[in-house]
Amino acid sequence: MESKSHIHQKYYVPEQSSIPIIFAFAALLVGFGAANAITGNGTIMLWIGMIAVVGTLAFWWSIITKESQAGLDTPQLNNSYVYGMAWFIFSEVMFFFAFFGALFYIRNIAIPWLGGEGPTAKGLAGELLWPDFEPTWPPMITPEQSLLGENAVTKGPAENMYLHSIRDLGTWLPLWNTIVLLSSSATVHVAHLALKENNRKRFNFWLGITVALAFIFVILQAVEYYEAYAHLGLTLNSGVYGTTFFMLTGFHGMHVLIGGIFLLTQLMRSANYNHFTDKEHFGFEAASWYWHFVDVVWVCPVSYTHLRAHETTDN
């Protein structure tokens, strides 16, 4: 008699596809387009790449969904989806780790050294490289501005985005963004519980609330950027403070937008096609994992770019 350990399960092997290669080229276009769009030369490339990415993913996901609904998935294939999503989220963690590492280095190593701490002396570092340098974060003046004044291209902001400079906490957008995002983490969990109870109506309701909160966050983020540019003078030309601020918050905001679209896709599948059961709902689970990851990551940008400021090094 053949033992249970030797019983082989059927494994569905998809047909060969060029979709991964097309997606890779589309993502490459997005990267080059975004880099060149800063100088005003890559906007068209960026939009072409974004359209190609969205179209490719939509087509790819539709194929996977059809295969799942046709019963072609096996436990082995489902495990490969789980591991694939886990590695994808891990790679995203490494992205954020690199950006936070850069900000940590600037704030905790570079600025104190320029201020006279560490192996470099103030006379060698600060006085030669930047005579008017003040070892505080965020720097409100750029090296070019200290030399050229109003003729400088890169200028520090008139005000910063940190909590201590806010006069009215009720209008402080990062606070509302935090409330919105943490609330959405709770609502997506409630939706998951409803799905496990096979309550589709409640699942659709709470998932819809989560999607709405996701796009509210994106809108509030856009309003905050407008306020930074129009009223605070904080732009990408505001030196290291401007670049790190917009890199971290913008990169996170992009992930919120992607996560919102991901959740919206699951809502449409459930509401329009009655996809998902209390036992089989990995598409939603993957979206919820990604969303919880986005929520947790937000704590770091809001702490470093909105709460902790003006760390002064005494000379």
Which role fits each region the language model picked out?
Residues 248, 260, 281, 300-302:
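Functionally important transmembrane alpha-helices
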Residues 208, 212, 250, 290-293:
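Hydrophobic residues within alpha-helical transmembrane segments
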Residues 94, 179, 223, 254-257, ...:
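Active-site His/Glu-centered metal-binding helix of metallohydrolases
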Residues 45-53, 248-257:
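Alpha-helical transmembrane segments
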Residues 95, 213-217:
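Alpha-helical transmembrane segments of multipass membrane proteins
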Residues 305-314:
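Conserved small/polar residues in nucleotide/adenosyl-binding loops
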Residues 1-86, 90-93, 97-171, 175, ...:
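Membrane-interfacial helix termini and the short, flexible loops that connect transmembrane helices
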